[in-house]
Amino acid sequence: MGQKIDPRGFRLAVTRNWSSKWFANSQNFPGMLKEDIDVREFLKAKLKNASVSRITIERPAKSARITIHTARPGVVIGKKGEDIEVLKQELQKRMGVPVHVNIEEVRKPEIDAQIIADGIASQLEKRVMFRRAMKRAMQNAMRLGALGIKIMSSGRLNGIEIARTEWYREGRVPLHTLRADVDYATSEAHTTYGVIGIKVWVYKGDMKPGQVSAEPTQPEKKMRKGGRNAAAN
């Protein structure tokens, strides 16, 4: 079912590519996969304030190439490139092979699902009202060309006693259509009341066979609100 599965894995090899690009035999595969997970967790913790969208890992010929997609490349690189050199040395110690680090700038962070989710989580940790944070993110995404966006928050919202789920949607988010370019991400806000989970779906348009990204057209003006038992598209 399109509503239940991760939209990224559902569209893998159809409209999306792998985030880890390497080959290994059955003996080395588990260790290399665990290493990729550890590297991503390390980078996300290290670059928490750099608005990191995604991290791509390649392993050509006894080396590693890591591409960091970020909305704030200056924070990653640092003054005169000092921070990126320190980061490269730490990654080489962890992976045990020469590491090349590439930085790619995210041109429109307002329609990037991971950056939106992390931004909402950061606001919730600063005690911003969850409805205000969600609606502001939706307005920015639709203004900059997204065709649809859906945001869901779950937990003790605004510190209530019983945890619940609220979601908002503007435009359309077709989860069953494989050619639809749907970006999806999750994040967590660690508040004084507990953990609040955030899920974000961003629909950027339909993609043609072999196309990597699509330019969104004029957005459709429509908003829906749902509660705990609401069914979403």
UniProtKB/Swiss-Prot annotation:
Keyword check for Protease: no
Record-level GO BP terms: translation
PROSITE patterns per the UniProt record, alphabetical: KH_TYPE_2, RIBOSOMAL_S3
Stretch list, region Disordered: 209-233
Gene3D superfamilies associated with the record: 3.30.300.20, Ribosomal protein S3, C-terminal domain (3.30.1140.32)
Alphabetically ordered keywords of this record: Ribonucleoprotein, Ribosomal protein, RNA-binding, rRNA-binding
Cellular component terms (Gene Ontology): cytosolic small ribosomal subunit
Residue intervals passing through the bilayer: none
Limits of the KH type-2 domain: 39-107
Tagged with keyword rRNA-binding: yes
Recorded superkingdom: Bacteria
Single GO MF descriptor: mRNA binding
SUPFAM superfamilies the record matches: Prokaryotic type KH domain (KH-domain type II), Ribosomal protein S3 C-terminal domain
HAMAP family: Ribosomal_uS3_B
Known partners and oligomeric status: Part of the 30S ribosomal subunit. Forms a tight complex with proteins S10 and S14.
Family: Belongs to the universal ribosomal protein uS3 family.
Function: Binds the lower part of the 30S subunit head. Binds mRNA in the 70S ribosome, positioning it for translation.
Annotated protein name in UniProt: Small ribosomal subunit protein uS3
Lineage of source species: Bacteria, Pseudomonadati, Pseudomonadota, Betaproteobacteria, Neisseriales
